Design a protein with these regions (language model features):
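Short, basic (Lys/Arg/His-rich) helix/loop patches that form interaction surfaces
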Residues: 34, 230-312
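Conserved tyrosine-mediated DNA breakage-rejoining catalytic core shared by Y-recombinases
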Residues: 152-184
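N-terminal core-binding DNA-recognition domain of tyrosine recombinases/integrases
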Residues: 4-103
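DNA breakage-rejoining catalytic core of tyrosine-based enzymes
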Residues: 100-117, 170-181
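Solenoid-like repeat scaffolds
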Residues: 58-59, 120-128, 154-163
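Alpha-helix N-cap/helix-start motif at helix boundaries, enriched for small hydrophobics
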Residues: 137, 148-153, 256
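Active-site/catalytic core of tyrosine-dependent DNA strand-transfer enzymes
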Residues: 182-243
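Basic, Lys/Arg- and aromatic-enriched nucleic-acid-binding interface segment
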Residues: 116-147
């Protein structure tokens, strides 16, 4: 950490919770790169100078941004009270946590946009490689499935006549753009693999299983899927094939906002409370209901940022 002694003093005074202290230290680890470039501590910078740093240090959601912003402002205010610290820039307290630009580079706007992204990262569907499983993983994210549930979906859960996936008494859409990849995952009992030395494809049998995410030797796990897709996504970004920085969660929230947007275009007022109630398994109490309302409010604020990014 830059100015480690000062920051460690702040962290100790900020919270006694280990989780919060850990988050603070992670925040300052990210700030170190900027502080070394400036040759100065965060507390000396203006709101404008801190904007780019804050965009990197915080996550995508309103809750994450607000938490990160709270640490930053608390640190600056704390520095103002310390007699051995000078040069604190009070203008930094005017910094805002709202920036739709991040949504432009970390979400997709529509199924067409997602398909374009997947095309830039993975092999074409008709090559019939294992990368159709990777595509399907992200299409299930876009449809709204919980990340762990993806690996529990069976062939019988997929209905191409109604273009839906039925699982655990819920219905998830199959988007036209993703149907081919999903169909190959359901129907093919083999995958093709390209030999790098010859450029020719060989056919490999998939394991006998009812699960969609079946590979050559086993059904893929969340751990192996995250490792494989993270590598492919980073490679595409590094090679300039895309400027998007996506993950399962970012694709998932993109799908949530897209469906809400389609409802809004049909005249339905955006309301995330039914959604947060549906995904929350806790029995209702007054305090719990207030918490759900707050979560719905955060989703709505993020949704507005996502909509703003559509016009940029």
């Amino acid at each position: 950490m830059f100015n480690a002694e000062i920051k460690e003093r702040f962290v100790k005074s900020y919270s006694s919770k280990i989780s919060v202290r850990t988050s603070c230290k992670q925040f300052f680890d990210i700030s170190q790169k900027y502080e070394e470039q400036w040759g100065a501590d965060l507390y000396t910078r203006t709101a404008e100078e801190l904007s780019q740093f804050l965009a990197e240090a915080s996550g995508l959601t309103t809750q994450s941004r607000n938490f990160t912003l709270s640490i930053l402002k608390s640190y600056i205010k704390w520095c103002m009270t310390q007699s051995d610290i000078s040069g604190v820039c009070e203008d930094a307290l005017q910094i805002s946590a709202t920036y739709s630009e991040k949504f432009k580079t970390q979400t997709v706007t529509s199924p067409i946009h997602l398909q374009r992204y997947l095309d830039s990262v993975f092999a074409p569907e008709d090559d019939q490689t294992i990368e159709n499983l990777y595509r399907t993983y992200f299409w299930m994210a876009y449809a709204g499935l919980n990340q762990n549930d993806v690996f529990k979906i069976k062939n019988k859960d997929v209905d191409f006549s109604d273009m839906v996936i039925r699982y655990n008494e819920k219905v998830y859409p199959i988007y036209r753009e993703g149907a081919k990849a999903i169909k190959y995952c359901v129907e093919l009992d083999y995958i093709r693999s390209e030999r790098t030395n010859t450029g020719k494809f060989i056919t490999i049998d998939r394991i006998d299983s009812d699960f969609i995410m079946r590979g050559r030797k086993s059904v893929l796990t969340l751990k192996s899927m995250k490792e494989r897709t993270s590598k492919k996504l980073k490679e595409a970004l590094d090679k300039g094939k895309t400027d998007l920085r996506l993950s399962y969660f970012k694709v998932w929230i993109s799908g949530l906002f897209y469906r809400m947007f389609m409802d809004e275009l049909s005249g339905i007022k955006p309301d995330f409370l039914p959604f947060v109630k549906d995904i929350d398994s806790t029995k209702g109490t007054k305090n719990r209901l207030n918490d759900l309302k707050n979560r719905a409010k955060y989703y709505y604020e993020d949704y507005q940022c996502w909509k703003d990014s559509l016009n940029k």
